[in-house]
Amino acid sequence: MTEVGWWKLTFLRKKKSTPKVLYEIPDTYTQSEGGAEPPRPDSGNPNSNFNTRLEKIVDKNTKGKHVKVSNSGRFKEKKKVRASLAENPNLFDDREGKGQ
């Protein structure tokens, strides 16, 4: 009988337990007893909800100002550059008058 090498055991992934409930039934669907068809949003296009969510994600004016996408596709956080004392010489002048 052959034994499994120790190196094979290190690279095996354990199976994650699957959730008992794979999806949730929306409350609006359970409240409509007689209707065989689930209620739809006011717009006729089923992708309209998806499109509005996508616009919120892609909208560069409101969110993601502090994030930059590099050439490799990773998100890089833009860091604020602090003003130096050379640019603001009067920044700490009020401390000298207080005796500190």
UniProtKB/Swiss-Prot annotation:
Cysteine pairings via disulfide bonds: none
Disordered as annotated region, ranges: 26-100
Biased composition (Basic and acidic residues): 53-62
A Pfam family of this chain: ATAD4
Record family assignment: Belongs to the PRR15 family.
Protein name: Proline-rich protein 15-like protein
